[in-house]
Regions:
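Residue-level signal for secondary-structure boundary sites
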Residues: 10, 27, 99, 117-119
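Segments adjacent to and within acyl-thioester-processing domains across lipid
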Residues: 116-170
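Catalytic strand-loop segment that frames the active site of acyl-thioester-processing enzymes
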Residues: 1-40, 165-166, 170
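Single-stranded nucleic-acid-binding OB-fold domains
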Residues: 8, 96-103
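Active-site helix/loop of acyl-thioester processing domains in fatty-acid/polyketide metabolism
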Residues: 2, 24-26, 38-66
Length: 170
């Protein structure tokens, strides 16, 4: 996996970030999404794109806080399958408003070669907020968020079993 940031360049002269990910048949999403038709969820690619934009903001020292996607558009024109080799991400910064703590950006995701673009991410907007602005307690999350992991595991296994039964009867 590679990660690269640069300020003051890119499509709009404001900066860009690139990243890549080596796909493995052992990646966790392939065994459950979808049974008998494995594919990486499109939302996984979208989330990685948004994470890369947030990383650019932090690495550039321009915007800080908890990032939240505010708006955006995207188009999927392909899939990432278990035999895909590598995913390439690119984020181009359109502009950032430091006082308003907002980032505008676009980009794409390609599979196997940087030229094989399968997801287009049009104009996106991301805001950066403090814990107080989001009404998040100012203490470690373990003090206010304590999920019942055993129940979560039971529910996940039930879902997998029900999915297997469903596909066996198709």
């Amino acid at each position: 996996t590679d990660l690269y940031f640069e300020e003051g360049s890119g499509k709009y002269g404001k900066g860009y970030a690139t990243a890549s990910y080596d796909v493995s048949m052992e990646d966790p999403w392939f065994w459950c999404h979808f049974i008998g038709d494995p594919v990486m969820p499109g939302s996984q690619g979208l989330d990685a794109f948004l994470q890369l934009a947030g990383l650019w903001a932090g690495a550039s020292c321009e915007l800080f806080g908890r990032a939240r996607a505010l708006e955006g558009n995207y188009t999927y024109n392909g899939q990432i399958l278990p035999f895909s080799k590598k995913i390439f991400y690119r984020v181009d910064i359109i502009r950032f408003l430091k006082k308003k703590k907002v980032l505008f950006f676009e980009g794409h995701l390609a599979v196997d070669t940087p030229e094989n673009i399968i997801y287009q991410f049009g104009s996106n907007k991301m805001g950066f907020f403090t814990k107080a602005e989001l009404s998040i307690p100012d203490k470690p999350s373990g003090e206010y968020y304590q999920p019942d992991w055993e129940l979560a595991k039971i529910k996940a296994l039930e879902w997998i079993e029900n999915a297997r039964k469903y596909y066996e009867h198709k």
